[in-house]
């Protein structure tokens, strides 16, 4: 199932991680995407400039025609991945059938994207 939300996330940042939490990557200025083995942060449109459209779903079901900015494995020990704000508000949630998933992230532009697509595939 593919889900989409439109939000203006606090701090213009979203996180993808296991619902049980993850080790958040340390901030690095001017980096759109940062990651650890258990969490990914993605910058988005400045919150005062409007909303960002965020889509989460199986890789085969999402639009992968954007700019690929992430392609790696994410630990999912609770078998549920979430997209959340820097304040911990869950925006999107998806059950997965494995404790590790391959994740691809696509954006519509490298600076302040207002469209972010997250595709996942079980390993």
Per-range role (PLM):
Residues 63-94:
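Extended, solvent-exposed segments with strong compositional bias
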Residues 35, 76, 96-98:
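Surface-exposed coil/turn segments at beta-strand junctions on protein surfaces, enriched
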Residues 97-106:
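A glycine-anchored, Pro-Gly-centered beta-turn/N-cap motif
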Residues 93-95, 119-120:
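Functionally constrained cores in energy, signaling, and assembly domains
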Residues 1-67, 111-123:
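Primarily secretory-pathway and cell-envelope proteins
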Residues 87, 107-111:
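Generic hydrophobic/packing signal
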């Amino acid at each position: 199932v593919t889900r989409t939300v439109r939000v203006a996330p606090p701090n213009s940042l979203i996180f993808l991680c296991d619902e049980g939490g993850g080790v958040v990557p340390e901030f690095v200025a001017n980096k759109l995407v940062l990651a650890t083995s258990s969490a990914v942060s993605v910058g988005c449109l400045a919150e005062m400039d409007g909303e960002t459209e965020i889509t989460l779903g199986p890789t085969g079901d999402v639009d992968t025609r954007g700019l690929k900015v992430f392609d790696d494995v994410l630990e999912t020990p609770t078998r549920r991945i979430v997209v959340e704000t820097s304040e911990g508000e869950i925006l999107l949630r998806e059950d997965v059938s494995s404790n590790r998933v391959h994740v691809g992230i696509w954006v519509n532009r490298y600076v302040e994207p207002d469209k972010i697509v997250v595709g996942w595939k079980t390993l």
